Amino acid sequence: MNLHEYQAKQIFAQYRLPVSKGIVCHSLDDAVSAIHTLAGDTWAAKCQVHAGGRGKAGGVKLVRSEAEIREFCNQWLGQRLVTFQTDKNGQPVNTIYLEETCLIERELYLGAVIDRSSQKIVFMASNAGGMNIEDVAAQTPELIHKATIDPLTGAQAFQGRELAFKLGLSGDQIKQFAHLFVQLAKLFIEKDLALLEVNPLVLTKQGQLLCLDAKMVIDSNALYRHPELKALQDPSQEDAREADAAKWDLNYVALDGNIGCMVNGAGLAMGTMDIVKLHGGRPANFLDVGGGATKERVSEAFKLILSDQNVKAVLVNIFGGIVRCDLIAEGIIAAVNEVGINIPVIVRLEGTNAELGREILANSSLRLIAANTLTQAAQLAVKAAEGK
């Protein structure tokens, strides 16, 4: 689960991490009032969306007057911000975060992720702050310095000092960085995070380290023990179909293609999407109904696919290991009868009760196209989506 920048910074403050003073604004009046409360004569206005690349998209701007903040709010509040991390529709801007600015001497990067191979937390630090860390890793990997944290023992101050030396910090800056490093690691572990980023972490002209941006991604599997974090969830930033899918324990990710895919098993789902792409098609979604699919879940999955107006054909690829193909067939029939359908549906069933499943579909009087192999199914789906 993603958090907004202002939410992450509020949590940062609880862990005694240095952040700028800011005010959350939900309306133009809030923003105008905020600039009279915050110090200084220049403020950073930031659109709050669950996506990176806000600055390049115009969603972050320095404002120096009431007129400028009015212009910024009128431009973005209630609108959608499109960045390189969003789809073509962008994310809705319901909140603007207005905060005090500082004079910057240097921009650094500090982030943490889970290394699943070693089952440890890896911190990454770099002098290339303010940049896309993926680009830095690809083009200049020598600029990234790492420290590995055992979650059972936590971060050690000496690890923070070692990173500080590599970043070229000196004097009191090293002490500040070590404190920041240890506290971020504590936050990462205690809040069950999957990702943590401070980009940029700046060194001000006064020699103080400051978290100028903050990104937190919480492991959704751990939310049951963090109700205070669950309460921070912003449904407006999530795809409505993905939210509906979660209610039925369906793994759904919306894409921009025109061939709906319903598959059981994440690996098979990705393989199905690859085969569709190989034959010139464009998947409209990733949808894994899971190994314990019931008739009801399959029905909901089918309705979910058909709710996408861009879908011109549906490819159902089921391998019956745990799940029974006859249940899948009954779910498809139930969904089609309930929702109605006027697009081709290609079905490939293999495994447990596959013959029975095919028989159920054949006797349903529905317009379904049977496929014997995955390659044939993909080819039929691509042709159907093209109207051939």
From Swiss-Prot:
<dbReference type="Pfam" id="PF08442">
    <property type="entry name" value="ATP-grasp_2"/>
</dbReference>
<feature type="binding site">
    <location>
        <position position="264"/>
    </location>
    <ligand>
        <name>substrate</name>
    </ligand>
</feature>
<comment type="function">
    <text>Succinyl-CoA synthetase functions in the citric acid cycle (TCA), coupling the hydrolysis of succinyl-CoA to the synthesis of either ATP or GTP and thus represents the only step of substrate-level phosphorylation in the TCA. The beta subunit provides nucleotide specificity of the enzyme and binds the substrate succinate, while the binding sites for coenzyme A and phosphate are found in the alpha subunit.</text>
</comment>
<keyword id="KW-0067">ATP-binding</keyword>
<feature type="binding site">
    <location>
        <begin position="53"/>
        <end position="55"/>
    </location>
    <ligand>
        <name>ATP</name>
    </ligand>
</feature>
<feature type="binding site">
    <location>
        <position position="213"/>
    </location>
    <ligand>
        <name>Mg(2+)</name>
    </ligand>
</feature>
<dbReference type="InterPro" id="IPR017866">
    <property type="entry name" value="Succ-CoA_synthase_bsu_CS"/>
</dbReference>
<dbReference type="GO" id="GO:0005829">
    <property type="term" value="C:cytosol"/>
</dbReference>
<protein>
    <recommendedName>
        <fullName>Succinate--CoA ligase [ADP-forming] subunit beta</fullName>
        <ecNumber>6.2.1.5</ecNumber>
    </recommendedName>
</protein>
<feature type="binding site">
    <location>
        <position position="46"/>
    </location>
    <ligand>
        <name>ATP</name>
    </ligand>
</feature>
<dbReference type="GO" id="GO:0000287">
    <property type="term" value="F:magnesium ion binding"/>
</dbReference>
<comment type="pathway">
    <text>Carbohydrate metabolism; tricarboxylic acid cycle; succinate from succinyl-CoA (ligase route): step 1/1.</text>
</comment>
<dbReference type="GO" id="GO:0004776">
    <property type="term" value="F:succinate-CoA ligase (GDP-forming) activity"/>
</dbReference>
<dbReference type="InterPro" id="IPR005811">
    <property type="entry name" value="SUCC_ACL_C"/>
</dbReference>
<dbReference type="InterPro" id="IPR016102">
    <property type="entry name" value="Succinyl-CoA_synth-like"/>
</dbReference>
<dbReference type="GO" id="GO:0006099">
    <property type="term" value="P:tricarboxylic acid cycle"/>
</dbReference>
<dbReference type="GO" id="GO:0005524">
    <property type="term" value="F:ATP binding"/>
</dbReference>
<dbReference type="InterPro" id="IPR013815">
    <property type="entry name" value="ATP_grasp_subdomain_1"/>
</dbReference>
<dbReference type="InterPro" id="IPR005809">
    <property type="entry name" value="Succ_CoA_ligase-like_bsu"/>
</dbReference>
<feature type="binding site">
    <location>
        <position position="199"/>
    </location>
    <ligand>
        <name>Mg(2+)</name>
    </ligand>
</feature>
<feature type="binding site">
    <location>
        <begin position="321"/>
        <end position="323"/>
    </location>
    <ligand>
        <name>substrate</name>
    </ligand>
</feature>
<dbReference type="Pfam" id="PF00549">
    <property type="entry name" value="Ligase_CoA"/>
</dbReference>
<keyword id="KW-0436">Ligase</keyword>
<comment type="subunit">
    <text>Heterotetramer of two alpha and two beta subunits.</text>
</comment>
<dbReference type="GO" id="GO:0006104">
    <property type="term" value="P:succinyl-CoA metabolic process"/>
</dbReference>
<dbReference type="GO" id="GO:0004775">
    <property type="term" value="F:succinate-CoA ligase (ADP-forming) activity"/>
</dbReference>
<feature type="binding site">
    <location>
        <position position="102"/>
    </location>
    <ligand>
        <name>ATP</name>
    </ligand>
</feature>
<dbReference type="GO" id="GO:0042709">
    <property type="term" value="C:succinate-CoA ligase complex"/>
</dbReference>
<feature type="binding site">
    <location>
        <position position="107"/>
    </location>
    <ligand>
        <name>ATP</name>
    </ligand>
</feature>
<keyword id="KW-0816">Tricarboxylic acid cycle</keyword>
<comment type="similarity">
    <text>Belongs to the succinate/malate CoA ligase beta subunit family.</text>
</comment>
<feature type="binding site">
    <location>
        <position position="99"/>
    </location>
    <ligand>
        <name>ATP</name>
    </ligand>
</feature>
<dbReference type="InterPro" id="IPR013650">
    <property type="entry name" value="ATP-grasp_succ-CoA_synth-type"/>
</dbReference>
<keyword id="KW-0479">Metal-binding</keyword>
<keyword id="KW-0547">Nucleotide-binding</keyword>
<keyword id="KW-0460">Magnesium</keyword>
